[in-house]
Amino acid sequence: MRNKRKYIRTTGIILLFCVVLLNTACASKQKEKVVLELKQGLLSLIPLNQNAVRVQFSQPGSAPMEELIYTEKLPVPEYEVTEDKQSLVLSMDGISVEFDKGTEVLTFKDANKRIILQEKVGGRFMKVSSVQNEPTYQVEQRFVSPKDEYIYGTGQFQDGYLNIRGLTRRLTQVNTQISIPFILSSKGYGLLWNNYGLTDFNPADQFVELTPANASGEAVTVNTTGTSGNVRETRQTYSFTASVDVPRSGSYSLLLDVGQRMARKYYLVIDGQKIVDVNNLWLPPTTSAIVELTAGKHDIEVQGERNDKPVLYWRPVSEETVFRSSVAQMLDYTVFAGNGDEVIASYRELTGPAPMMPLWSLGYIHCRERYNTQAELLENAREFRERKLPIDMIVQDWQYWGKYGWNAMKFDEDRYPDPGSMMKELHEMDVRLMISVWSKIDAQSEVGKQAKEKGYYIPGSDWIDFFNSDAAAFYWQNFRTGLLKYGIDAWWQDATEPENDDLQNRRINREQTPGEVYRNVYPMYVSKTIYEGLRQDDPDRRAMIFTRSGFSGMQRYAAATWSGDVGHDWETLRRQIVGGLGQMVTGLPWWTYDAGGFFRPGDQYTNTRYHEQLIRWIQAGTFFPLMRVHGYMSNTEPWRYGEKVEHIIARYLDLRYRLLPYIYSQNAAVSFNGSTLMRPLVMDFPEDRFALEQNYQFMFGPSILVAPVVESGVNRMKVYLPECSAGWVDFWNGTPHKGGIFTDVNVDLMKTPLFVKAGSILPLGPQKQYATEETEQPWEIRIYPGADGSYSVYEDEGINYNYEKGQFCTFDLKWNDSDKTLTISDRKGSFAGMKERMDFNIVIVTPESGTGIYQSKVNKSIVYEGKSMVISL
């Protein structure tokens, strides 16, 4: 038995020790961390909670990084340190990290002492660099990634990859791309790379610059949108060519950089084979792909715009995962051990819980670019009510400020003569309003002139410098006095990247800091300003912020994101679903897209091919955390597309509203338990290889498997039903299916494949026109037999923060499959307006009952008055 020394942290006492680590250095154990003094620098192991360890590698005297992510002040967890001649191990209940004294490699293990992650030998890298003539470091860490690992995350990207093992990505904030340096692995860990600037994931150092060849195709004029409003642009495609030599055959990761801040087209051909072909009026400047190449020379063609300067980067796909940041104060990352829920719950414990979203935000959000007048907005809200189409919120997009200048924090009275009466009428219809507010302010506006005089702009731009606390306070003051007074319900913070990665080569924070240092965190500063202002100045209204970009920790500011200004085609639909799932694993739980696409065809109202696309976008979006439609220069209301389309959309609106008791209970699980509503299959089936390979299927809460239709003309499609001992039940027809199989599903335009896990209990509410509508109609409690199951129902007022004071209630539904009994627990807690009596129709799902959207045959009707009940069925 090896001789070991053991050190246990004792509360309130700092134990220090120094031992020889072979030929390296010594270690000191402090109250909050263990510091290893290596020849190359200081390696700190910092226990954060029982399943998370932070690793920092720095140089002596390095200034600590400003803490923007880990804001929760938690006690130092109990941990112990053991040491022998070969290693030093820091251990907690849920994770341990072992330092190898010979290789200086860190190995991470879970609660069962199973290796979940390991650094590569020689994979820790830190070198002196500079940014804007100021000293900084370039840092890099390489990890071992076995071939059977699946990795997800880094945020919302447009490359179409859900499993990003081996894929190269460049993490910057631009329209349609939300960069979050967090990954989740099928091996049972999450990793957050603690850096606020540009980060390269699996960076490719080999590259070729392509040279212009010729123009191809005719010039076309298109309508586009940007920070200066609607613009018509003339575009023509140009070809660029090059060749590359690869030394060996195998898989290669490619990163195409178009050489501008935004792209309009990705078109990459290798040896005549099309690799990428994507068009949109807005695209991130980089995209990625993994291809198989044989050893030798390969001809490359890229098509783009005349001013593009395309560069193709490439690297062999190998058994490693790499993070690299070019601007850093130290190498800094955190490892979380556990399954997907445990990882994200741990992350939120450290970075802040996601507040409860308002109940009404989980209904239907209707948006278009744009309503031009107060009368037009009210007319369309009335039409929703007259047509009995459920809606909770209507959205006023940009340019309501009119003659006062961009984002002047006021309505142009020529078109919006009385915003107060507009809000009153909307609220009388039980319709909420979201309004677009930007971080950019016209420097010639009244507010802009003040901002310029006070030095509150980021120099050389029209973006407010939210890194300057005085500038942020100024912004909120004008926000409060100009807009908050009307009782507006939700706030759309557009273009918060800021648009086009606009901090590069700029100075921020009173010109004291290079923008590159905080290049990816601007959206979090904006959301923080708005959320904290709302909590202070509108404390009785539950906040909802809608923003186009995000970063780690932003969930604590009641911020939801969407996928930006995307197109409408099938490929774009597929990429949005993948992008949303990529964000879900990073801990930011609220997301959606522009259902139907932001950029739509000119004949959208009569084009039946587009109608099919629109329906499939809306069907998928019914099962997103937020359900929303939007479109550029479009009247997006359902009735514009004809009776057939309107009827199908109405059915899915009904389904969304019937699911609200289920969705709102998951809203509580997100806030209280660190859960996730829209769930890539790795979160529930990490051992199922076929599940891990499904790009478009996902779980909606713990019970519902969603398989969106993402291709044209589909009448029948294959759906994978993950391994599940009790199997699955078809939502539409009640047919049971085994788990771990592919099944063929008949798909017509009315249906998107939905399966419910056997043993699930779905609480379905009555049909409603808005989420907070009071009705005496009963709930339907659907029981999917085949296994025991349970569901915890949560209720509160839905519109305020009284839940933070304990004013909410819960009750549990438990199904015993063998004796066919449903037990309803005592109700726990209470809140103002709580129904003392609830009517339930209980249904055991079979092919003859409990199928589809609407209520059907009932097994038993009961009255629940808050006391425990056992119902035999």
List the predicted regions and their residue ranges.
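Bacterial N-terminal signal peptides
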Residues: G12-N23
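Bacterial Sec-dependent signal peptides at the C-terminal "C-region" and cleavage site
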Residues: L22-K31
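Short, well-ordered beta-strand segments enriched in hydrophobic/aromatic residues
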Residues: L45, V55, L90-G94, F240, ...
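A low-complexity, Ser/Thr/Gly/Pro-enriched, surface-exposed linker/loop concept
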Residues: I46-S91, R124-S130
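Aromatic- and carboxylate-enriched substrate-binding clefts and catalytic-loop regions
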Residues: S58, Q118, D277, T287-A289, ...
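Solvent-exposed beta-strand/loop surfaces of large extracellular or lumenal domains
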Residues: M65-E80, Y267-T287, K454-Y457, D730-L749, ...
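Catalytic and substrate-binding clefts that recognize carbohydrates or anionic sugar/phosphate headgroups
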Residues: E83-M356, R368, Q374, A381-E386, ...
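Catalytic core of carbohydrate-active enzymes
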Residues: E532-G533, D540-A543, G550-W562, Q583-Y593, ...
